[in-house]
């Protein structure tokens, strides 16, 4: 009888591939640590032999779910975007754990993290509120300063964290996004057709909630949401969109992006606040960022208006290249973090 494949098994295999690639040696899966089953952690942590842990971290009135890889001397926080969860880092985190303590979080409203109530102005789901919460998570874990990587919405939370808490961030890497105010400021028909979640999910409730809840898996069938994953991972991702409270939270985050987040960006620009730590920007080769902003020197040119020390390059793959091409992505990121 064929046994069902669990998310924990998939992460175990990802770790095996990462270790094998790094060492050039084929390893038996029996030599790898046993992973915790894919279920919500109870208490402070649910740990195995030390290579992979899951925990619920209390942050005031909310709880943030984390996956923790390794025990390296340099802490690294990794933040997913829409429509993913911390599971998107399953290929990269094991390799990065050779040198880092890697903390992969589920943002509030996503995955297994809590779903705090929103407000009329959407502030609880602004990038500022989400960034503040991640600082609280890292403080709880004992990390006063850390490297930071974010993809998609997680990239926007990450650059906001670097602007609001510059003393916390050693190095910043932002994958396949530009600042929120720049995105809206450059918006045209091509932008709307490409980045449809910006337009749809920011509409007044309950319209977008009804669309997402009515077809929870549809976002993963659209080219924007497709990526390199099998049915087990798809099922794990889709769980978020079967929960009406989480769907509302995600829409609230997009509403904040169309209002408060723009205000916060504009205030930074007016006050000449910039990202001062070393920054890496990666984007998908042949993806929208490769062509939408050519008049500005590409997305890298846009980031140079916001950051003092930024470098970047294109990575083969689509928007979800951390999953589609984790080897090249990890290699570039490791080089940046080691500089």
Task: Kindly label every feature range from the protein language model.
Residues 9-17, 25-43:
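N-terminal twin-arginine translocation
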Residues 44, 50-52, 62-64, 75, ...:
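Flexible "cap/lid" subdomain of the alpha/beta-hydrolase fold that forms the substrate-access gate
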Residues 69-115:
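Conserved HGGG/HGGXW glycine-rich cap/lid loop of the alpha/beta-hydrolase fold
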Residues 318-326:
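Catalytic histidine-centered segment of alpha/beta-hydrolase-like enzymes
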